């Protein structure tokens, strides 16, 4: 059995962060990065979700082997819980362990998806999140394009004291990544929110790159397939990678859907499809 391990779990603030109820599944002892990784590791072993929170939140996994670029087929897949009307896209990044030290400290390459290169897609987008001054408060943020806003505190659903990760000691932190144009809309008659999908290339997205077997009703078992050949440099040119050793998934939208809260990518598993 080939093994995968989580190397980093740094979500943005969100409704599932620090949550100790059954849904969030935290213990309240996740007060260090190491404890957060241990918790996320157990979650994936239990086939439960890890939320990446709002825009820029990420998880990094490594493997005990390199995943080769197999050509035309999908090389690996990531499980989310998307279904029609409920997509929360995560951007995928890959890395080779060039220096051979077993750590994800080399260069990240984005895997292009359907939105890569579009005018409304922003690379190197930054959002700085600020620790709330008190309990049960919204989390304020400022983005690199000059906007400001907040991650809503949802008192009716997620009642933990803070949505700001307990294992981040700083009073603010900045997350960087590629930001897609949001596709969430509210029906003015029913009040229901619709998080529409993107064509292909994203985790937790009801796209045309899904692996068969997931539920279209509640998103359970929903997986998206990814090709190493889609790795690109920052300028959009092909990276031509022959293999990868690390995968990062980063929440790719800065948006919220009313009572549903922030749009936040969820991951359940990572699987090498070349074996």
Regions found by a protein language model. Give the residues of each.
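Low-complexity, serine/threonine/proline-enriched polar segments
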Residues: 114-218
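Acidic/charged, solvent-exposed loop-and-adjacent secondary-structure segments enriched in E/D, K/R, S/T
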Residues: 11-52, 171-173, 178-231
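Acidic, glycine-anchored loop motifs typical of Ca2+
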Residues: 98-107, 209
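Short beta-strand-plus-loop segments that form exposed binding edges in beta-rich domains
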Residues: 249-256
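Short, small-residue-biased leader/transition segments that mark boundaries at the very start
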Residues: 1-6
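Exposed low-complexity, polar/acidic, P/S/T/G-rich flexible segments that act as propeptides
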Residues: 256-275
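Extracellular Ig-like/FN3 beta-sandwich strand-entry sites
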Residues: 241-246
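Short N-terminal edge-element motif at the start of the domain
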Residues: 29-97
